[in-house]
UniProtKB/Swiss-Prot annotation:
Motif 'KMSKS' region per UniProt: ranges: 551-555
Its job: Catalyzes the attachment of valine to tRNA(Val). As ValRS can inadvertently accommodate and process structurally similar amino acids such as threonine, to avoid such errors, it has a 'posttransfer' editing activity that hydrolyzes mischarged Thr-tRNA(Val) in a tRNA-dependent manner.
Cellular-component GO terms for this entry: cytosol
Family to which the UniProt record says this protein belongs: Belongs to the class-I aminoacyl-tRNA synthetase family. ValS type 1 subfamily.
Cell compartments where the protein resides: Cytoplasm
List of residues binding ATP: K554
This protein's name: Valine--tRNA ligase
Motif range ('HIGH' region): 43-53
C-alpha cells in the first residue's frame, strides 16, 4: 500500500478509483437482497452535463451507494434520449457550419438520418464520460438509447396496443405549429408571455341591406351616441386571419343583435357571406360584443366551429405563408407581410374603424422562440381522460408518493384538466409511426411491421403501402422508460433484465418542471400497459440558479459546467466557453466583463467530492436552489480537513493491527462512540426522508467539529500519556471511528473516502477490497453505556472552549503556560476537574489548576463561566495591561468608523439598488456590531 500523500489532490486519484470500481463490477446488480432501483431521467444525446444533471445525479448516486452498502440489490438504470426536435436542430446547425452546402432537405430523409446516426456515434458518449467523472455508480453495461432496437420495439408495441384499445386515433385537429421546425409541438413546449401589440376594429357589412340601431353610453349610463348602422364592428389582434373567418358571433341574450342572429355579413376583402351565430362564449361587455370566428386558426374558435358545424378554412402553409385558400393577391405572403397588406386594403376601403395599443399573450416555441401558429392538420392523438383518471388515483391513494407532497396539487390540477395528447411530429429523426396507408384507397392500417399489416388484412403484393412519414414525439418513448429498459415486451429479454424484480423502481428523482411531460405519462403508461406502478416515490428537486438567484442559461452567460468545478478552468477558457456560439453577439462584452469580475483567476479545481457534498448541502425541498461557489470552496476545505485528520490517525497508528470494536478506556473514546451512534441513526433518517441537506449538515458537524476538532484533540493526552493501555485503546478507537466516518460519508464523497479507507483497512483487519461494499453504519454497531461519559465530555469541551476564548481575547501566545483558578461550582464540577486535570493541563497549556478557598478574593483575572463554575485566568504576567488598553481603544475607534459608514450607506440606498447588494451591506453592519461588542467586552475586562 502506497503511503498517503501529504496533501489532498483529488485529480491524482479520482479517475483511477472510478476505473477500478467499474473494472471490478461493483456497480452491477448483485442479484441478492431486496431490490433497489433508480431510473436516470435520460439526458438528451445532444447534450453535455450541466448543473441540473449534476445535481440530480449526485442525489441518485448517493441513494444507490447508500442502499448498496446496506445490502440491497441495486440497479441504477441509465441511458440517453434521442431528443427528436433538439437533435434535428443541432445536426442541421452543424451541417450549416460545415459549409458543404448540405441541408436537411437536400440530403433527404434517409441521408439526413444517416448524418444524425454519425453524429450520435461521435458525441453520444460524451455525457456518459462526464457522468463517470462525477462518480456515477451505474451499471453501464445496461445503458440504453431510446432508439435502440429493444426500446424501439416497445414503442411500436405500445402504439399498436393503444390503437387497438381505441386510445390512439388520427384526426384533423388544431395543434400548436412551429413554422420554423415545421412540426406540431405540445402545449408544454409553448411559452406564453405578455407582449405589446394592437387591437384593430374592422367593419363587416351586413348582407341584404340589413341594419340596426347602435347605441353607446358612458360609464354612468348616459347615452352618448345613437345611430343606424348597416355593419358590425369586430375587433381582432390578427387581422390577416379574417380571410379565414367562417362566422361572426354574438351572445344569445344580447338584445342589440337578437334580430341579426341567423343573418349574414359580407367578409371584407373576399366578398364571402358568413353567418351571424349566437354562442355563450361571447363576452357582451368586451368591445362591441361581436366576435369574428376563425376555426382553423384559434383554439377557442375551433371549439365554437365544432359546436356550430362551421367550415374550417386553413389559410397557411407549414411555414406560415398564405396558401391557395386566401385571395390570389395575398397568396405566398408571410403572415406578417399579409397582415400589413390586409390592413392597407382595409384602410383604403375605409372600413378600418380603429387601431389601438393592446397587451396580449403571445405563444412562442420554447426551442425556436417563434410565434406558434394554431394550425389545422392531420395528427395522431392519445385519448387521455381514462388514463388520467387512473393516473390520478395511483397518486391520491398513496400507491405513489410525491416528495415534497405539495406537488400533488399541481399534478391533480393538470390531470383534471387534461387534453388529448398530440403524439405525431413532422420530423425525420425519431420512432416512425407504425401505420401504413394504401396508396390507392387511402385506407390506414396499424401494425408492428408492414409484414404483420399485410398478413392481418390479407393485403397482397399488388397493394402499395406507404408508411406514415411522421414520427412520435420524444415523450412517447420516454414514458415507456421504466419498463422498456427491462426488456418489455420481449419475454426473454424481460427475464434476462429482471422485469419482475426491478419494476417498480424505488424512487424517481427529477425536476418539477417535467411533472407533466414525463412523470404523469410514465404513471399512466406503466399502469395501462404492464399493470404496475413505475416507481414508489418521486422526489422533485428544485431548479438550480446562480448565486444571485438567476436562471442559468447560455444567453445570460452564467452557466457553470460541473466539470469545470471538478477539474478547474482558466479565466480565458471560461470566457471563451461562455461567449462562444452566442445567439446574441452583442452580449459577448457584457458576459466577458461579468465573468472576469466573478472569477478573476478562473475556477480552481475542487474535485468531484467537494462538488457532490455542496450539492447535497444545497438540496432543500424548495423550488429554487442558489448555487454558491463559496460553499464549494468550503466543502473543498472540508475534504482537506478530512484528509489531514486521516494523516494524523495514520501517523499515530503505524504498525497497528486491530480487529472488531474497541473496548474504550477513556471518556473521550466513550463520548465519540456515543456521538457516532447518534449520527449514524440521524443519517439513516435523513436518507429515508430525502433530506440530503440535513444529511450533509449532520455529517459535516460530526466530521469537522466532533471528530476532527474535538476527538483528535482529546485523544492527544492519552496518546502522549504514560498509560500504555489508554494509548493503545485510543489508537484503536481513532482508526475504528474514522473508518465508520468514511462509511458514513462514502455515498456523498466516494472518492476521498475510498482513497483514505484503503490506507486504514489493513490496520483494522477488514476483509473487503472496497469501501463501497462495506456496511453502512447503524447505531447498533456502537451501542454502549456511554451516557455519563457523553455528559462529562460535553462539560469538558465547554471548559476548554471557555478558557481558550479567554486566552484568545487576551492575545496570549498559544504556547505560553498559564495558571487556572477555579471558584464556586458544584460537587460534580470538582469531581470532573479531578478526573480531567491531565487533559485540561495538556490541552490548555496550564501550569497549574487551583481552587480558591471559600471567601478567598480572586486575583485580577479574565473570567468565564460554565454552569455554576467560574474559571479565572490571572492577568499578572500575561499581558501589558496599558499597551493592551491602548490597542483595544484604537481598534474600537476603527470599527466604530466602519460601522457608521455602513449605516450611512444603508440609509442612502434607494429602491433601485439590487436586493442582493442591500442584503450584503446589512450583513456587513451586523458583522461590525458583533466585532464592536466583542472589543468593548474585552476592554471592560481590563
Amino acid at each position: 500500500m502506497t503511503q498517503l500523500a501529504s496533501s489532498y489532490d483529488p485529480k491524482s486519484f479520482e479517475t483511477d478509483l472510478y476505473e477500478a470500481w467499474e473494472k471490478a463490477g461493483h456497480f452491477k446488480p448483485s442479484g441478492t437482497g431486496e431490490p433497489y432501483t433508480i431510473l436516470l431521467p435520460p439526458p438528451n444525446v445532444t447534450g453535455t452535463l450541466h448543473m441540473g444533471h449534476a445535481f440530480q445525479q449526485t442525489l441518485m448516486d448517493a441513494l444507490v451507494r447508500y442502499h448498496r452498502m446496506r445490502g440491497y440489490d441495486t440497479l441504477w438504470q441509465v441511458g440517453t434520449d434521442h431528443a427528436g426536435i433538439a437533435t434535428e436542430m443541432v445536426v442541421s446547425r452543424n451541417l450549416a457550419l460545415e459549409g458543404k452546402g448540405e441541408t436537411r432537405d437536400s440530403l433527404g430523409r434517409e441521408g439526413f438520418i444517416g448524418k444524425v446516426w454519425e453524429w450520435k456515434q461521435q458525441s453520444g458518449d460524451i455525457i456518459e464520460r462526464q457522468m463517470r467523472r462525477l462518480g456515477t455508480s451505474a451499471d453501464w453495461s445496461r445503458s440504453t438509447f431510446t432508439m435502440d432496437p429493444q426500446p424501439s420495439a416497445a414503442v411500436n408495441e405500445a402504439f399498436v396496443r393503444w390503437y387497438e384499445q381505441g386510445l390512439i386515433y388520427r384526426g384533423q385537429r388544431l395543434v400548436n405549429w412551429d413554422p420554423v421546425l415545421k412540426t406540431a409541438i405540445s402545449d408544454l413546449e409553448v411559452e406564453s408571455a405578455e407582449e405589446d401589440g394592437f387591437l384593430w376594429s374592422i367593419a363587416y357589412t351586413l348582407d341584404d341591406g340589413l341594419s340596426y340601431e347602435h347605441v353607446e353610453r358612458d360609464a354612468d349610463g348616459v347615452e352618448t351616441l345613437r345611430e343606424t348602422r348597416d355593419y358590425l364592428v369586430v375587433a381582432t389582434t390578427r387581422p390577416e386571419t379574417l380571410l379565414g373567418d367562417t362566422a361572426v358571433m354574438v351572445h344569445p341574450e344580447d338584445a342589440r343583435y337578437a334580430h341579426l342572429i341567423g343573418k349574414s355579413v359580407v367578409l371584407p376583402l373576399t366578398g364571402r357571406r358568413v353567418p351571424v351565430i349566437a354562442d355563450d362564449y361571447v363576452d357582451r361587455a368586451f368591445g362591441t360584443g361581436v366576435v369574428k370566428v376563425t376555426p382553423a386558426h384559434d383554439f377557442n374558435d375551433y371549439e365554437v366551429g365544432v359546436r356550430h358545424s362551421l367550415p374550417m378554412i386553413n389559410l397557411f402553409t407549414p411555414v406560415a405563408a398564405l396558401n391557395e385558400n386566401a385571395p390570389e393577391r395575398f397568396q405566398g405572403l408571410d403572415r406578417y407581410a399579409a397582415r400589413k397588406a390586409v390592413l392597407a386594403e382595409l384602410e383604403d376601403l375605409g372600413i378600418l374603424v380603429e387601431t389601438k395599443a393592446h397587451k396580449l399573450q403571445v405563444p412562442r416555441g420554447d426551442r425556436t422562440g417563434q410565434v406558434i401558429e394554431p394550425y389545422l392538420t392531420d395528427q395522431w392523438f392519445v385519448k387521455m381522460d381514462d388514463l388520467a383518471k387512473r393516473g390520478l388515483e395511483l397518486v391520491e391513494d398513496g400507491s405513489i408518493s410525491f416528495v415534497p407532497p405539495n406537488w400533488i396539487n399541481t399534478y391533480r390540477h393538470w390531470m383534471n384538466n387534461i387534453q388529448d395528447w398530440c403524439i405525431s411530429r413532422q420530423l425525420w429523426w425519431g420512432h416512425r409511426i407504425p401505420a401504413w396507408f394504401d396508396e390507392a384507397t387511402g385506407s390506414c392500417y396499424v401494425g408492428r411491421s408492414e409484414e404483420e399489416v399485410r398478413a392481418k388484412h390479407s393485403l397482397g403484393s399488388d397493394v402499395v403501402l406507404n408508411q406514415e412519414s411522421d414520427v412520435l414525439e420524444t415523450w412517447f418513448s420516454s414514458q415507456l422508460w421504466p419498463f422498456s429498459t427491462l426488456g418489455w415486451p420481449n419475454e426473454q429479454a424481460m427475464a434476462e433484465r429482471g422485469f419482475d424484480r426491478y419494476l417498480p423502481s424505488s424512487v424517481l428523482i427529477t425536476g418539477f418542471d417535467i411533472i407533466f411531460f414525463w412523470v404523469a405519462r410514465m404513471i399512466m403508461a406503466t399502469d395501462n400497459l404492464v399493470g404496475k406502478i413505475p416507481f414508489k416515490d418521486v422526489y422533485f428537486t428544485g431548479l438550480i440558479r446562480d448565486g444571485q438567484g438567476q436562471k442559468m442559461s447560455k444567453s445570460k452567460g452564467n452557466v457553470l459546467d460541473p466539470l469545470d468545478i471538478i477539474d478547474g478552468i482558466s479565466i480565458d477558457d471560461l470566457v471563451a466557453k461562455r461567449t462562444g456560439g452566442l445567439m446574441q453577439p452583442k452580449m459577448v462584452e457584457k458576459i466577458e466583463k461579468a465573468t472576469r469580475k466573478e472569477f478573476p483567476d478562473g475556477i480552481a479545481a475542487h474535485g468531484a467530492d467537494a462538488l457532490r457534498f455542496t450539492i447535497a448541502a444545497l438540496a432543500t425541498h424548495g423550488r429554487d436552489i442558489k448555487f454558491d461557489m463559496n460553499r464549494a470552496e468550503g466543502y473543498k476545505n472540508f475534504c482537506n480537513k478530512l484528509w489531514n485528520a486521516s494523516r494524523f490517525t495514520l501517523m499515530n497508528t503505524e504498525g497497528a493491527a486491530f480487529t472488531g470494536m474497541p473496548t474504550p478506556r477513556t471518556d473521550a473514546e466513550r463520548w465519540i462512540l456515543s456521538r457516532l451512534a447518534a449520527v449514524s441513526s440521524e443519517a439513516q433518517g435523513h436518507y429515508a426522508n430525502y433530506r440530503f441537506d440535513l444529511l450533509a449538515q449532520c455529517l459535516y458537524e460530526f466530521a469537522w467539529n466532533e471528530f476532527c476538532d474535538w476527538f483528535l484533540e482529546l485523544s492527544k493526552p492519552a496518546l502522549n500519556g504514560a498509560d500504555a493501555a489508554d494509548a493503545e485503546s485510543t489508537r484503536h478507537t481513532l482508526l475504528y471511528v474514522l473508518e465508520a466516518l468514511l462509511r458514513l460519508l462514502h455515498p456523498l464523497t466516494p472518492f476521498i473516502t475510498e482513497q483514505l479507507w484503503q490506507q486504514l483497512a489493513p490496520r483494522l483487519g477488514l476483509a473487503e477490497t472496497t469501501l463501497s461494499l462495506r456496511p453502512y453504519p447503524t447505531a447498533a454497531e456502537f451501542e454502549g453505556d456511554f451516557a455519563q461519559a457523553e455528559a462529562d465530555v460535553e462539560w469538558l469541551k465547554a471548559v476548554i472552549s471557555a478558557v481558550r476564548r479567554v486566552r484568545s481575547e487576551l492575545n496570549v501566545a498559544p504556547s505560553k503556560q498559564v495558571p487556572l483558578r477555579l471558584q464556586a461550582g458544584l460537587e460534580q464540577d470538582r469531581v470532573r476537574i479531578e478526573r480531567f486535570s491531565a487533559s485540561l493541563s495538556f490541552l490548555l497549556k496550564l501550569d497549574s489548576i487551583q481552587w480558591l478557598a471559600e471567601g478567598e478574593s480572586a486575583p485580577p483575572a479574565a473570567a468565564a463561566i460554565v454552569g455554576e463554575l467560574k474559571l479565572l485566568v490571572p492577568l499578572e504576567g500575561l499581558v501589558d495591561l496599558d499597551a493592551e488598553r491602548v490597542r483595544l481603544d484604537k481598534e474600537i475607534a476603527r470599527v466604530e468608523v466602519e460601522k457608521e459608514k455602513s449605516e450611512t450607506k444603508l440609509a442612502k440606498f434607494t429602491d433601485k439598488v439590487p436586493p442582493a447588494v442591500v442584503e450584503q451591506e446589512r450583513v456587513r453592519l451586523v458583522d461590525w456590531n458583533t466585532q464592536l461588542a466583542g472589543l468593548r467586552e474585552q476592554r471592560a475586562k481590563l
